[in-house]
Amino acid sequence: AYGAQGGYYNIMNNYYKLGPASAKDKTHARFFTAYIDDGKNAQDAGVFGYFYVNGNIMDNTCVDLSGEQQKEIASANANNISSTAFKVKNDERTSSDLLLDMRIDILSDYSFMQSATDAYETVLAYAGAWTCGWKDNEYIIPERDKIDRRIVSETANGTYSTNASKGGGYGLIDSQVDTIEKWDEYITATS
């Protein structure tokens, strides 16, 4: 991720799952790149954000990663604010100017947290569109639709089944048309 010219940010307990395209990218071990405002937004030049960065994990299971990339990811996981993991886009400020020692307090109603690994497992277990309900007086056991089953499987296994129609690769797409499949028919009823 990048940006955040102004404001306060907790970047905590996120799980970053690298795909095959990530191994070709120089940001394979980067959690965030902070930008300093250049004055083109609705604020003065030089405005920057403040960040608390901790508990994030960059998955290193992509088979296309080199040994050096594996080391850089291990460094980012061990220290989320290392120069590999957190960058500042220009030379006006150093990362230590932007980083906070304590997380930014938020309303307690919004502060439920899981570890990055637990959050990843929760998403794999529960995310997506689920079919359920009644059909012909029989209850349908909830299950993901086929598209979300494919997406969860590809995420868990680090694989892909689609490519860009205009020449891209490694699972990156140019348009939603590149991923069109026949959608499941969902049961509708009035309540």
Segments the model singles out, each with a brief description of its role:
Residues A1-Y2:
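An acidic, charge-biased composition feature
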Residues Q5:
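A short beta-loop-beta micro-motif enriched in histidine and acidic residues
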Residues Y16-T190:
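Long, contiguous C-terminal flanking segments immediately downstream of a protein's structured core
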